[in-house]
Amino acid sequence: MENGCTSHWLLSRIAGSESRLANNRAFRCGSIEKAASYLIGELLIINQAEAKSNKRLPKFVHKADTYHKACARCKARGKTCAYGQGAVEKQTVHKPRGQASSVHMPVPMLVPPISSAPSLETPPESVAASPPTVDSIPVSHHVNEDPEAEPDLEKNRAYYTAHGRFAGQVAAAINERAGLIPATCNQVPLVDAPLFGDLNLPSQSCALSSSTELPPRAYADQLIDIYWQHVDPMEPVLDRQRFLENYEKAYSTPITPLCADYDLWLGILNVVFALAVQRQELNPLHQRNEEANRFFQRAWVLLPAESMLWKPGSLELVQCLMLMNRYLHCTNNQQKTWTTAGLAMRIAQSMCCHLTETPLLKGSSDDKALKQKVWASCVALDRCISWSLGKTSALVLIPSPPPSSPQQLGENAMHDTLGLRLHEIGNQIQLAQIQNRTSLAARFRPPLLSQQDEYHNAALQLDACLQDWENSIPSDWQPRNLRMVTDRSSRAERYLLHLRYLHHRIFLYRPMLARFYAMKPDTQPLHKSPSLSHRLLRESASMCIEAAQQVASLVNETLEPDEPIGLLPWWYRIYYLHIAGANFLAAMFRSELFTDSVSQSWESVMLALRAHEHLSPYVQQCLWTFETLAARITGKPYPSMDGGGCGLMVDGSSGVSFDDIFKDINFDFDNFIFGPEDFGEGLV
């Protein structure tokens, strides 16, 4: 039926209901959705009348009749509703088999846009945000019913987010989880886990009466000493000489402002106090969080939004934002964490901190060195924020370090040079992943080169870059020699540098790990030998697990139970332990990956996390989540929050969904790889 005929047919059928339409308030008020719903109701009434006289209405009326029922079925099966607005539009393009033509109807007039059908690209937030329950998990929520599906769907599946999250069979194994209490801890360290407790930030328009107060000089000296010894070496931001000069003036003349931006400097000082308080691991939990949060709230009030957005930028403003961002990183303020990092990066760029030579700018060599130091910290901060929050980091031009030998560089210059080179490799890794996840890249990809093959080609070159970086490290910087470094600050710097290097390796190999676990175990026929692509995929997954093992080993080396302050900040230790633990959970699905060595590394991660339970309530929740997920895979009794055991879980061979396991720790492998907008990985 043509569009014009359809319109006349509708008018003739509804003409008899003109009086009811005129009296309908929704129709008179111009509500399109309600009016469309009313029209469908009229069509259903006509449908019932026509059925009595054995007359048949056009096919689309029958679809309207079954709209809500079909939506319920599609929702239960986890598929996009075939009767949704977007799906109907697609059906008008593809002709069904066995029909010469299909009826093309004006969809907006027939299907009320009451609710959009679930998108295949992004799962509904309500589903992604809540852990699965026994009754809410379907038996099979990924059944390909499209007879014209792409033949290479399985091949590119792990590299294309449009196909949604990984699907798997849940079958009878889900019924055996009837007594399971779903994990309520979906938070991730340095993402949204409140490691520093609940931080309530006051409105910046409401100044705190104590915002300009300073602690007693003796206690302040103690906190300043802790910061320079145990916080600044990890990520240097401030110039020590300038900071100490202003610090002395603040206590010698506390009433007279030191400079025009006195409030800004007080904000820096209060964040320094807050980080130093959190660094003391032996202090009682509630006392530490309460005191540190009070210092941070003072700094927050002292830095109003107008000073960040509309006033000219300064190095002090960038430094204050970076310090604030470090603290916010360990709270549940994701939006403020992401925003402060972006502001610091943009303001630093506006000041040309990213340029090695700025002949038009006046300033001493010390100012230029400080700008380069701040810019290097900005890049490191942006990388940490973006990879942990699952956002795309800024692909900025990083100045090339001077081509000097290790003997010609000092210790600090060597650390900065290695850091800049590593950040540049990280830029290339992320760029390769972004290029592979865009539709534009797929359009210009050679016909015989799949998304998987293209990323594998890039990964080979990037792996060589990482290997060259590791080979360029002097012998006394190698991991095997780190324990022999006598200077505590230097040893901490080198440990953190190697942890970041291993993080880059995990970030590079994780797409292949995701692809490896998306493949069904029986996809390879028994009578055929594994292909080269399959072997490379398996080897890449093994290298990802090996990097996670090295992360766990390095973190355990830094543990010093007898020291009041650990070698590395305790929030970084929890962060990297969480990364390693998630990869070990993935290894449990494959016997060729979860070897005895990996099992020992898994146990070391659990022991290390138990040693951090006194530092944050989140650690106990993380432990319980890891133990529960491991029990689901291995079939051992899973624990409860009170320490008791629960029923038995089944092993991975019985059809437990891989994504169903990892959604409880907010870990979406598919979104992490190549999401349409963000990476979407909670762990990185």
Curated annotation (Swiss-Prot):
One Gene Ontology MF term: DNA-binding transcription factor activity, RNA polymerase II-specific
Keyword set includes DNA-binding: yes
Phenotype of the disrupted gene, per the record: Has low impact on expression of the sorbicillin biosynthesis gene cluster but, except for very low levels of dihydrosorbicillinol, impairs the production of sorbicillinoids.
GO CC aspect terms: nucleus
Alphabetical list of InterPro entries matching this protein: Fungal_SecMet_Regulators, Transcription_factor_dom_fun
Source organism, top-level taxon: Eukaryota
Ranges where the record places region Disordered: 114-151
Subcellular location, principal: nucleus
Keywords: DNA-binding, Nucleus, Transcription, Transcription regulation
A matching Pfam family: Fungal_trans
A biological-process GO annotation: positive regulation of transcription from RNA polymerase II promoter by galactose
Function, in words: Transcription factor that acts in concert with sorR1 which is a transcriptional activator of the gene cluster that mediates the biosynthesis of sorbicillinoids, a diverse group of yellow secondary metabolites that restrict growth of competing pathogenic fungi but not of bacteria.
UniProt protein name: Sorbicillinoid biosynthetic cluster transcription factor 2
